[in-house]
Amino acid sequence: MGIGYIIGCLFSILLWRLDRQRIFNFISVKSKDKIKNVYVVQFLYLFLIFVIYLGLAFIKNNQVYNAITAFIVIDISNTERENLKNNEKKHFYDTISTISRALICGFITPLFLIVMFGNGLAIVFTILYNLSADEDLNILGFIVSIANIIPSIMAEVFLYIIYVFRNRNLKIKFKGDYISNLFIVPLLNVDILAAFIESVNFYSYHNGNNMHYLKSYGDYNNKIDNVCIKDYLSISYSICFLVFIAFLVIQLI
């Protein structure tokens, strides 16, 4: 049964103010101060993470281990709540991405990995995800993006259904970028769907052909404000609830 996962999830929600990324950011800063080559740093991280995974493989599954795993990997960040206090437009755009990232990386992907591969790989993903917040660690970021592909599609299915019922429209304009986003920046497609649901524009920076440019997605019918952000946040929590129920059902089968 999934009682251990339920307890771990509840503790994670109760301790939502615990900023895991601040801990990993401290580790990353100290490591880069000692070792100047970021590729060497990433190699050492991957080696240590592999050792951790081997150690976790020897732990027998039980409800205590399940509870600890759920507490570690489920991380609905408090960052978006903090950003609600800031009314600058830039912060609202950041907040949409933060909510999407928390939904995928802090919830759906870890649970997906538990179902498919067990607790150990979910913990490994969480470590990689938090370390990859440092954009210099591009290899770790690439691994995290690959792991997010299928979970992103799962979230997009929920978001698309909500979009269709709310807007009475089947068409989403990804401007020909859906496939490239899916394999390079899978979370961007989630952000785009969120923009269409809330009827706002979402801007993304792109690099290509020696050019840096800004691309706009969504519909400019509303401005991004507290109401929009709170609505998307509630949608995100609803998806988390449905995914967790499905996860528990799978555990019972």
For each predicted feature, which ranges?
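Hydrophobic N-terminal alpha-helices or hydrophobic patches in metabolic proteins across all domains
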Residues: 1-253
